[in-house]
């Protein structure tokens, strides 16, 4: 009976995944092929327990393990397709892109290799940082990214991070884990204000932003892509607080429609996905949209 329940659960999960391929703009023309690729890569990762090097999007290379979100670049065309495609429309060669919580490098590789941005990538967990570094070394760059093995907070010092949670390691609330050096966003941006920032720090967004109030006030920073999924509650922070802070600094939340290439203002956050676009300079961002992407998967 237990086996039947397990198989039923897995079948429902695979079916749900297939339905997502039918709506993904990059796989909806052939969702069955995407499903085959999904099953194949997961067989290699979970059953054979291999590390696999994938090649995607005009030749980008990345080594992946089970649990990595970046695996989506193999079976789904792109990991976090909506946000990735938006950034591919937005970013231009020479733009400054700050990837906070880079993990093994999805957005670092996308911004630096496809769009040829000048990237600074921040990843606090040493083992994850090593994988990020290896993925960077596996590719040829026009502008070599700056990689920082530190965390960010509202003040400089040290914090304890978990290190046994695969791709979701974060600041430890129990005090157990590894000590990591942390700086503030304002320190990191003291020499150059980035054009665009991506933040994914597993609930610690409030503290990262409060360490960068001067940076947030600078008009050169035009857009922040930030993950808001209620995980700030682990640190007694509500998403509403983060949104109000960003609004106070001139960043308003929007949803981008890939088909019409238009922006719709929203009051809160994008509830259809984890990441939300907060835009300070809508005219500038809108002026970048509309070009046809050259994609080879």
Show the residue positions of the predicted features:
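S-adenosyl-L-methionine
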Residues: 1-125, 130-135, 139-144, 174, ...
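Short internal loop-to-helix segment that lines adenine-nucleotide cofactor pockets
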Residues: 75-96, 144-146, 157-160, 165-219, ...
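Short, conserved loop/helix-junction motifs that constitute active-site signature segments
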Residues: 111-114, 212-220, 246
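Hydrophobic pocket-lining residues within nucleotide cofactor-binding pockets
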Residues: 150-152, 201, 228
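Short alpha-helix
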Residues: 182, 237-248
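Conserved beta-strand signature within the Rossmann-like core of class I S-adenosyl-L-methionine
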Residues: 220-228
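A SAM-dependent methyltransferase catalytic signature shared across enzymes that methylate proteins
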Residues: 243-261
């Amino acid at each position: 009976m237990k086996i039947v329940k397990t198989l039923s659960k897995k079948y429902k999960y695979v079916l749900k995944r297939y339905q997502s391929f039918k709506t993904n703009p990059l796989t909806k023309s052939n969702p069955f092929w995407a499903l085959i690729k999904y099953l194949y890569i997961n067989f290699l990762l979970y059953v054979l327990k291999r590390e696999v090097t994938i090649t995607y999007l005009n030749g980008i290379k990345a080594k992946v393990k089970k649990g990595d979100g970046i695996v989506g670049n193999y079976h789904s065309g792109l990991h976090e397709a909506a946000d990735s495609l938006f950034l591919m429309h937005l970013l231009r060669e020479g733009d400054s892109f700050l990837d906070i919580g880079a993990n093994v490098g999805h957005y670092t590789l996308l911004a630096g290799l496809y769009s040829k941005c000048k990237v600074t990538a921040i990843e606090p967990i040493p083992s994850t940082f090593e994988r990020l570094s290896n993925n960077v070394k596996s590719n040829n760059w026009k502008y070599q990214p700056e990689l920082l093995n530190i965390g960010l907070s509202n003040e400089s010092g040290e914090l304890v991070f978990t290190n046994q949670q695969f791709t979701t390691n974060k600041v430890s609330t129990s005090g157990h884990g590894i000590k990591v050096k942390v700086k503030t966003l304002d320190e990191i941006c003291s020499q150059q204000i980035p054009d665009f920032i991506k933040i994914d720090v597993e609930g610690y967004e409030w503290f990262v932003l409060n360490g960068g109030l001067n940076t947030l006030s600078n008009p050169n920073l035009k857009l922040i892509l930030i993950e808001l999924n209620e995980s700030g509650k682990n640190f007694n922070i509500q998403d509403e607080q983060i949104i109000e802070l960003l609004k106070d600094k001139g960043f308003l939340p929007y949803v981008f429609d890939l088909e019409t290439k238009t922006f719709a203002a929203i009051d809160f956050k994008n509830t259809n996905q984890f990441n939300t676009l907060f835009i300070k300079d809508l005219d500038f961002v809108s002026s970048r949209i509309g070009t046809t992407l050259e994609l080879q998967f």
